[in-house]
Amino acid sequence: MSTIYMSQLPATLPLMEGDQDQGLYPAFHRAKDPPILFPFMIDSAVEHQGQIYGDQGLRRQQVLGESNQQFNDHMMMGGSDVFLTPSPFRPTIQSIGSDMIQRSSYDPYDIESNNKQHANGSTSKWMSTPPMKMRIIRKGAATDPEGGAVRKPRRRAQAHQDESQQQLQQALGVVRVCSDCNTTKTPLWRSGPCGPKSLCNACGIRQRKARRAMAAAANGGAAVAPAKSVAAAPVNNKPAAKKEKRAADVDRSLPFKKRCKMVDHVAAAVAATKPTAAGEVVAAAPKDQDHVIVVGGENAAATSMPAQNPISKAAATAAAAAASPAFFHGLPRDEITDAAMLLMTLSCGLVHS
């Protein structure tokens, strides 16, 4: 058995002479048949030697021999024109060869060969660099090269500016020195008595505080005394105002019901009065009142004695009048009686009118 492709055979075959049998070559005379992608098997002349005879057998052997030789030549040369009529649907040897992926000869575990190749400098494009490994590095806290903490952006920029100025001054041969402490390093130069930027930061702050204290001491002698007198005046006036308020609010401190409550003054006077050595009767003040009333025995001369809080003269007079026996008998005994008396008075007025 020998393998051949239909496309390897010539498109036209020589015409057979005489009355040769054309049925032996049916595939060679079908021009409209589609090309066959896969080879088919043709029996060799050795197997059909008993059936083939004469010139027909010789010609058939010659055609098969030429086709096999042509196919072998193309396969040995590896040409791209194996198929005489290329088609986009049939692969070619060249396209298959270009699509093949060639494996790299680099072995990452073969350390000795890799070292030799790097030493010799003979590296191909397939093994130019070993595969890189991804590394995740955690960014630590940024620290100052000197060991301190990170400065703020503004301070960092200012320090950088000061360092650049110092480097420039050192390059020019000029070194700035504080006129007070003779230091050459400071975060900020301040103005002083010797001129601008003649003091370091600490000396400038110290001298500024001293100047302010001296100015306050010079200008504050005359201004401090009036300020003290003005400040002391309200302190003396405020307690007086508070006392006046308390004295005026003595009568208004109680609720309205307690201030207008009607009390049986006769029973209260009998229970509360007690004779004294001088023959006077002392009427005890109710709980709601802030004074004690002393009434004489015969002439009923009423006087007022302050108990705890001082009261005005009008309040004392009203209290003395209320403490008299006639006033006690004239008042009703309770609210119901008072209401009945008011109702009778109104009805009596309506009848007489």
From Swiss-Prot:
Key words, A-Z: Metal-binding, Nucleus, Transcription, Transcription regulation, Zinc, Zinc-finger
GO cellular component: nucleus
Keyword Transcription regulation: yes
Location of the protein in the cell: Nucleus
Motif (Nuclear localization signal 1) on chain: 137-144
MF terms (GO), sorted A to Z: sequence-specific DNA binding; zinc ion binding
Pfam families reported for this sequence: GATA
PROSITE patterns (alphabetical): GATA_ZN_FINGER_1 (PS00344), GATA_ZN_FINGER_2 (PS50114)
Motif segment (Nuclear localization signal 2): 244-251
Disordered, as annotated region: 142-166
InterPro entries: GATA_ZnFinger_Domain, Znf_GATA, Znf_NHR/GATA
UniProt note: phenotype after gene disruption: Reduced chlorophyll, reduced height and increased tillering.
Induction conditions: Induced by light, nitrogen, and cytokinin (benzyladenine) treatments, but repressed by darkness and gibberellin (GA).
Zinc finger (GATA-type): 178-203
Function: Transcriptional regulator that specifically binds 5'-GATA-3' or 5'-GAT-3' motifs within gene promoters. Influences the expression of nuclear encoded chloroplast-targeted genes. Regulates chloroplast development and promotes chlorophyll accumulation. Modulates plant architecture (e.g. height, length and width of leaf blades, and flowering tillers production) and represses tillering, probably by modulating number of cells. Promotes senescence. Involved in grain filling, panicle development and starch production.
Protein name as annotated: Protein CYTOKININ-RESPONSIVE GATA TRANSCRIPTION FACTOR 1
